[in-house]
Amino acid sequence: MKVSVLAAVAAFAAATAIAGPVRPAGVGNDKYLIELAPGKTQWVTKNEKHQMKAAGQTFIDITDEFGTGFTASQPVSANYPKNSRHSSIVAPIIANLSKENLMRDLKAMIEFNNRYYESQTGVESATWLMEQVQKAIDASGIQGAKVEKFENQFQQFSIIATIPGSESTVVIGAHQDSINEQDPEGGRAPGADDNGSGSVVVLEALRGVLGSKALQAANNTNTMEFHWYAGEEGGLLGSNAIFKKYKSDGRQIKAMLNQDLAGFVKKGGPEQFGLITDNTNQELNQFCKMIVKKYASIPIVDTKCGYACSDHASADRSGFPASMVAETAFRDSNPHIHSADDVTDYLDFDHMLEHAKVAVGFMTELAMASNL
């Protein structure tokens, strides 16, 4: 990261930041409204968004909120279990999780030139992913289970798989898109870790849950949703659209677990999860720690990633409790992301399998929880 680039971005931000979402005179359709912190917004071009992303600046694109009166919400209340109560269901699911599936699925995802949200290959990769989800649902035979597209104002669509239950809903999500920060629209962006790893973890967790006869027999109390978001690299576009709609519709989203970066272990460093503690729900974070201790074989440490660093922030600002369990402490994250070098050579599939265990434990325990 060059100092000159950072200085230029800082100067640009200082010159163009505005106090609130007020459209300045002369702003055209080529400008996008982004939020860098609560209440701190500015209008930028797509290229400027890319430059800021490359310089390490995180943000959420709120262009479609302009003039709507949208305001961030406080999280809805939820009552999370203090201890695991359904290990007899979770343990067999975990035992059947497949590292080979993770490897196979990720190999397929990185074969697309990129999964950029405004590229044709971004649409093709989303189509492939949705086909895998549909196959898993078809194989399960679970009545009412379904997968749907969530269309966006850009090319790539988001994907939502649902296993029905009560109005209370538990979500596990991951963004499916990738980006090459040097050439966003056409550059090679395999996105093995960012975020092919999280995408295949959520897919394997879905397969595990769908394949559990014990869970089917127990008749899950709460609705389960598995999400794959489009356009995270453009400013949490896909997830923000979904959770804003859920807020508008009065949905009862009781918990959301974000899986973004799930495969990298720093050479010579400790193998551990990173629990994101900023812009997340502290009660749900404590539940995540319990799940990790119960079902995973590696520890978890607190870490921070900044405002709008990933899709949990979309759930959080719409008033839904959210957590993110990342591959490690943020300072030790994969240095190869957002480039052509984000490949599987740097990933640890055993570590990825640990993420899948946590995802299954999180979803199953909360799906069966009464009075969430």
From Swiss-Prot:
Subcellular localization(s) per the UniProt record: Secreted
Pfam families reported for this sequence: Peptidase_M28
Listed GO MF terms: aminopeptidase activity; metal ion binding; metalloexopeptidase activity
Any one GO biological process: proteolysis
Disulfide bonds: C305-C309
Cofactor annotation remark: Binds 2 Zn(2+) ions per subunit.
A GO cellular component annotation in the UniProt record: extracellular region
Residues that, per the record, bind Zn(2+) 1: H175, D194, D260
EC number, UniProt record: 3.4.11.-
Record key words, sorted: Aminopeptidase, Disulfide bond, Glycoprotein, Hydrolase, Metal-binding, Protease, Secreted, Signal, Virulence, Zinc
Annotated Zn(2+) 2 binding sites: D194, E233, H338
Glycosylation sites: N96, N195, N219
Chief location: secreted
Name this polypeptide is given: Probable leucine aminopeptidase MCYG_08380
UniProt lineage: Eukaryota, Fungi, Dikarya, Ascomycota, Pezizomycotina
